[in-house]
From Swiss-Prot:
Component of the chromosomal passenger complex (CPC). It comes from the Eukaryota. Disulfide bonds: none annotated. The lineage of its organism: Eukaryota, Metazoa, Chordata, Craniata, Vertebrata. GO terms for biological process: cellular response to UV; cleavage furrow formation; midbody abscission; mitotic cytokinesis checkpoint signaling; mitotic sister chromatid biorientation; mitotic spindle midzone assembly; negative regulation of B cell apoptotic process; negative regulation of cytokinesis. This is Aurora kinase B. Residues 93-343 form the Protein kinase domain. It is found in: Nucleus; Chromosome; Chromosome, Centromere; Cytoplasm, Cytoskeleton, Spindle. The gene is aurkb. Belongs to the protein kinase superfamily. Ser/Thr protein kinase family. Aurora subfamily. Coiled coil: none annotated. Its EC number is 2.7.11.1. InterPro entries: Aur-like, Kinase-like_dom_sf, Prot_kinase_dom, Protein_kinase_ATP_BS, Ser/Thr_kinase_AS. ATP binds at L99, G100, K101, G102, K103, F104, G105, N106, V107, K122. Its main location: nucleus.
């Protein structure tokens, strides 16, 4: 569960709201974005600059949930270095407005009282985790995400717990959820889609070189950072699988590759399929195998029944077709995605790739 994934923010009545009812794995339409009573120009400034700023009290900070920012790169770097080492309790934080609400808990804007560093604090209820039997999944998510360092992967700084709750200290992504951005615009143009694809491919290549398979790439699990860059934000279905081939079915139906639907073993190439589905959805506004029934969706996926609308360019269709191959070894490698002519011609990526590997 990413801090903005499958979250329907609700009104803020207490520091810790109650968990929402279970949501199905199949995608559902969201409610309108939460509009906080604390939304002010200061909050907007915060959203634009939080990743690069040291948070300090302002004249408006007497209102709960309201903070202002002043730039201090040195203080930010010091705070980042300290976060993984310190032991925390909930009393170490000023709790701001809620960012979202999910099946197992809630997410809040939070500020470390000691160094004024701002983050997203995900609060998970142990009773709900135990009820659903997903404690092992959370442990795996923490183990994986806390060790990843990439500009297109949401940072997990630390975690702590008390008798009733588990708290995940996450990077705050000021521009919010990519899925809502896609809903707002209907579909993305080629430049934005290609930029996201380059960022995604670079982040996934970083993961795969570390034997991490994500297995649940979709718009709901992606956030946008300070410059609008893509951030992979949910590692709930990821696995750290050195030399293992998996059989577990997971993820969202529209994004499942043929080998998972058919119950076959799978490896990191499931992420290549998901990248192809994602690219199609960026450009078209809906997944490529979307159908009225689950049965029909399954049929279209296993037959790779891929139909392109006429407005797609030849370059984008070529990339998608090379990713959506039935046989996993035939799918375009991530290095090939980043070097694809359509991506190179259209991507406007700002951050340089931080991970270079030899081609496989």
């Amino acid at each position: 569960m990413s801090y903005k994934e499958n979250l329907n923010p609700s009104s803020y009545t207490s520091k810790f709201a109650t968990p929402s009812s279970a949501t199905a794995a199949q995608r559902v339409l969201r409610k309108e974005p939460y509009v906080s009573t604390f939304t002010t120009p200061s909050d907007n400034l915060l959203a634009q600059r939080a990743q690069l700023a040291r948070i300090t009290p302002s004249a408006s900070s007497s209102v709960p949930g309201r903070v202002a920012v002043s730039m201090d790169a040195s203080s930010q770097n010091t705070a980042l270095a300290e976060l993984p080492k310190r032991k925390f309790t909930i009393d170490d934080f000023d709790i701001g407005r809620p960012l979202g609400k999910g099946k197992f808990g809630n997410v809040y804007l939070a500020r470390d009282k000691q160094n004024k560093f701002i983050m997203a604090l995900k609060v998970l209820f142990k009773s709900q985790l135990e009820k659903e039997g997903v404690e092992h999944q959370l442990r795996r998510e923490i183990e994986i995400q806390s060790h990843l360092r990439h500009p297109n992967i949401l940072r997990m700084y630390n975690y702590f717990h008390d008798r009733k709750r588990i708290y995940l200290m996450l990077e705050f992504a000021p521009r919010g959820e990519l899925y809502k951005e896609l809903q707002k615009h209907g579909r993305f143009d080629e430049q934005r889609s290609a930029t996201f694809m380059e960022e995604l491919a670079d982040a996934l290549q970083y993961c795969h070189e570390r034997k991490v398979i994500h297995r649940d790439i979709k718009p709901e699990n992606l956030l946008m950072g300070y410059k609008g860059e893509l951030k992979i934000a949910d590692f709930g279905w990821s696995v750290h699988a050195p030399s293992l081939r998996r059989r577990t079915m997971c993820g969202t139906l529209d994004y499942l590759p043929p080998e998972m639907i058919e119950g076959k073993t799978h490896d990191e190439k499931v992420d290549l399929w998901c990248a192809g589905v994602l690219c199609f959805e960026f450009l078209v506004g809906m997944p490529p195998f979307d159908s009225p029934s689950h049965t029909e969706t399954h049929r279209r996926i296993v037959n790779v029944d891929l139909k392109f609308p006429p407005f797609l360019s030849d370059g984008s269709k070529d990339l998608i077709s090379k990713l959506l191959r039935y046989h996993p070894p035939q799918r375009l490698p991530l290095k090939g995605v980043m070097e694809h002519p359509w991506v190179k011609a259209n991507s406007r990526r700002v951050l340089p790739p931080v991970f270079q590997s030899s081609s496989k």
